[in-house]
Amino acid sequence: MLLWFCAGALASAQVTAPPAAPPPAPQTLTLKDALERAQMNAPQFLAAISDTNAAREDLLQARAARRPSLTGKSEYLGTQGNGVFPSGRFVTNDGVHVYRDWAVVHQDFMAAVLKTGYRRAGEGEAIAKAKLEISRRGLAATVTKAYYALLTGQRKYATAQQALDQAKQSLDISQRLERGGEVPHSDVVKSDLQYAAQEQAFRESKLAMDTARLDLAVLLFRDFDQSFGVVDDLNLAPALPAFAEIQTMAEHENPDLQAANAALRAARLDVQIARQASLPSLTADLAYGIEANAFAWHSTVAADPSKGKVPNLGYFLTVSLNLPVWDWGTRSSKVRQAALKREQANVELSATQRTIMRNLQGLYQEAQTAREQVDSLRRSVDLASESLRLNGLRYQAGEATILELVDAQTTLTQVRNAYDDGQVRYRLAVANLQTLTGAF
C-alpha cells in the first residue's frame, strides 16, 4: 500500500511539472540594425564620441573664461602675540585674530575682448566632430563588408548544397545508365569524382559561412551572440548617381576635408594666440566682505581700540596691468613654432584634397565597373542554368558525354558564386564611396 502511494505521488509530481520554455527564436537583422548595434559596441567609435563630448566641454570652458567669475573665501588668521603690540608678531596682520570672509569677482578683459581662445576651442570641436563622422563612416564600411560577407557565405552555401544535389543526381543517372549498358564505367567514376569534389566544396562553404558569422558577431554583440540571421537585400542595391553629383557631395560632406580645414583654421588661431602673448594683460578683482579682528558686522580695531566699533563690511578693487618686457625670446620662439605648424596644416590640407579627388574617381569607377559586371553575370547565370538543363537531357539521351555534363555543373556553380561576389562587390564599392560623400 505504501509503495503504491509513493508511486502515485511520484507520477503526480511528474505530470504537474511545468513544461520547459522553448528557446527564443533567432533575431533577424537588416543592414541598418547591424550598423546601429555596431555603433553601440565599437571601441574606436565610442572613443570618437568621447573626444567630441570632451571638445564640447572645452568650448564651454573657453566661453566661461570670457565672463566674470565669482568665488567665495573664508579664512581665519591666528597670529602669536608679542605682549607689547596688539598686532602680534607678524607685521602683515593688525591683530592676533583676523577674520576674512568675502566674495571675489574676477574678470580677464583680454580674454573677453580678443576671443581667440574661444574661437580656437570652437575649431577643436569642429575637428572632433569631423573625426567622429570619419569614424562613423569607416565603421559603416567595415560592418557592411562583414554583413555581406555573411550574406554571400549563406548564398554560396546554398549554391554548394544545390551543386552537391546535382552531382548526386548525375551519379545516380550514370549508375543507372551503366546498368543498362548505355555508358561505360568511366562515366560512373567521373561522376563519383565530381560528387566527392562537391562534398568538399560544400564543407568549405559551410566553414566560410560560419567564419563570416563569427566576424559579424564580434562587431554586433557584446555577449558574442551567434544566434541571428541577416536579411538578403543584395537585389535592392542603391542606384549610382552621376559623377558630378558625387563630386558636389564630396566637396560639401567629406569629413576628412572638413577636419583638414578646421585644423588649418585652428593652426592660424594658434599663431594669433602666440602673438597675443606679447600684448599687455588687464585683469580686475573686486572683493566684497569683511577682513577684521572679529567675525562681526561691526568691531573694534585691535591696533586702535579707542576709536570704538567701526563697520567691517566693505570692498576693495585690484586692477592689474601686466606688460611683458623680456623673456629671452620665448614668446618669439612660440610664434615661430605655431607658424611652422600652420604651414604643415596647409600642406596636409592640400594633400587631403588631392587624395579625396583620387579616391573619389577611383571608387566611382570601381562602382561603375561592379554595376556593369552584375548585369553581365546575371545573364551568365541564366545561360549556365539553361546549359546544365540541356546537357542533362542530352546526357540521358546519349547525345552528350559525362565531361560535358560535369563541365556544365561546374560552370553553373562558378557563375552563381561570381554573381554573388559581383553583387557584394557593388555594395562594397558604394559603401566605400559613401565614406567620401555620405549617404545617397
Regions found by a protein language model. Give the residues of each.
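Short segments within alpha-helical structural elements
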Residues: 64, 197-224, 379-439
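Bacterial Sec-pathway N-terminal export signals of envelope proteins
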Residues: 13-75, 81, 107-109, 224, ...
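Bacterial N-terminal signal peptides
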Residues: 1-9
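Amphipathic alpha-helical coiled-coil scaffold segments and their short linker/junction regions
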Residues: 35-39, 187, 192, 222-299, ...
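A glycine-/polar-enriched beta->alpha junction
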Residues: 36-46, 53-69, 102-120, 130-137, ...
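Periplasmic alpha-helical coiled-coil/stalk elements that build and connect Gram-negative outer-membrane
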Residues: 138-252, 366, 370, 412, ...
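Small/polar, glycine/serine/threonine/aspartate-rich low-complexity segments that form flexible
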Residues: 16-26, 73-107, 231-243, 272, ...
